[in-house]
Amino acid sequence: MPLIPYALTRPFLFGLDAEHAHELTLASIARLQNTPLQCLWQQPRIDDPVTLAGVRFPNRIGLAAGLDKNGRCIDGFGAMGFGFIEVGTVTPKGQPGNPKPRIFRLPQAEALINRLGFNNDGLDAFLANVRRAGFRQGGGVLGLNIGKNAATPIEDAVDDYLLGLEGVYPHADYVTVNISSPNTQNLRSLQSDAALDALLGRLQERRQQLIARHGRSVPMFVKIAPDLDEAQVDVIAATLKKNAVDGVIATNTTLSRDAVRGQAHATEVGGLSGRPVFEASNRVVGQLRAALGAGYPIIGVGGVMSGADARAKRDVGADVVQIYTGLIYRGPALVSEAARALKG
């Protein structure tokens, strides 16, 4: 158990502006990771190994991308017991993201709305942080999530993804291609049939070159949205298989507000995460499993607020599970709770 129960620190954090609390938490973890004070949140990693896409995951619970966009706190989050950690989304050039305020809590629904817009320090700073981290050397799996700059026209998006893939490839256990954030204009259009096929074709061509150059095969995952109908999911699944993509992450945040109507901040623009996205995410995971068949790697994410939620996501077809908003509402104890629920 962490030395300081999260129930004692959450009221203080929730009394702050949501983004300020987020930045304060990251700054504290970055400062204290790999020091004796890491014991404040440290807990043992549950041992439950599973191999996906040729990568051995020490357990089935991971941190979703977006919480640590610049990879500043990899070892600190690793100390919470995660088997795998995904950092980013990183873009080739640093960018400030959308104007503040841009993160909103909906406590009644155990949810967040964000319209951050891929705010990050850029690829060079990101890779410097990744190189400093010892998480991989300790057996953890590190996923690096890449996206496009807001200033890059959508028709040139592939160039940004190629730059990202080139940069992160030597340092990643897997690479995630993020085409599903609702906060970068037109990004989700890359999920459409022809656009996705063209993007993945170019990325796989470059990946084969990188395999030859580095002498190792780093699997590539694609992260998709929950706001897709069954026909769209089937098209995406077929396109993933056609382009020999190693796995899929389902899902990102939702644009739907059906579950939070009438609540404070419910009308804010951005992606909704947390408990309200759980069912939509599980629906997409289940549809992907049916379309892709047994054995195709699926990382499930969206609305996991308890160990039972994590198990339910595995039961509908996810091989491993990620959390983000649940960590904000429940704290580090959720990591071990979910890992135990997913075991076996």
UniProtKB/Swiss-Prot annotation:
Keyword line: Cell membrane, Flavoprotein, FMN, Membrane, Oxidoreductase, Pyrimidine biosynthesis
One GO location term (cellular component): plasma membrane
Co-factor binding comment: Binds 1 FMN per subunit.
Naturally occurring in which organism (per UniProt): Methylibium petroleiphilum (strain ATCC BAA-1232 / LMG 22953 / PM1)
Record bears the keyword Membrane: yes
InterPro entries per UniProt: Aldolase_TIM, DHO_dehydrogenase, Dihydroorotate_DH_1_2, Dihydroorotate_DH_2, Dihydroorotate_DH_cat, Dihydroorotate_DH_CS
Pfam families assigned: DHO_dh
Superkingdom: Bacteria
Binding site for substrate: K69, N114, R115, L116, G117, F118, N178, N183, N252, T253
Protein name: Dihydroorotate dehydrogenase (quinone)
One annotated GO molecular function: dihydroorotate dehydrogenase (quinone) activity
Entry's family note: Belongs to the dihydroorotate dehydrogenase family. Type 2 subfamily.
Enzyme active site: S181 (nucleophile)
Subunit structure: Monomer.
Mode of membrane association: Peripheral membrane protein
One GO process term, biological-process aspect: 'de novo' UMP biosynthetic process
Cofactor(s) essential for the protein: FMN
Source taxonomy: Bacteria, Pseudomonadati, Pseudomonadota, Betaproteobacteria, Burkholderiales
Name of the gene this protein is made from: pyrD
Main enzyme class: oxidoreductase
Enzyme Commission number(s): 1.3.5.2
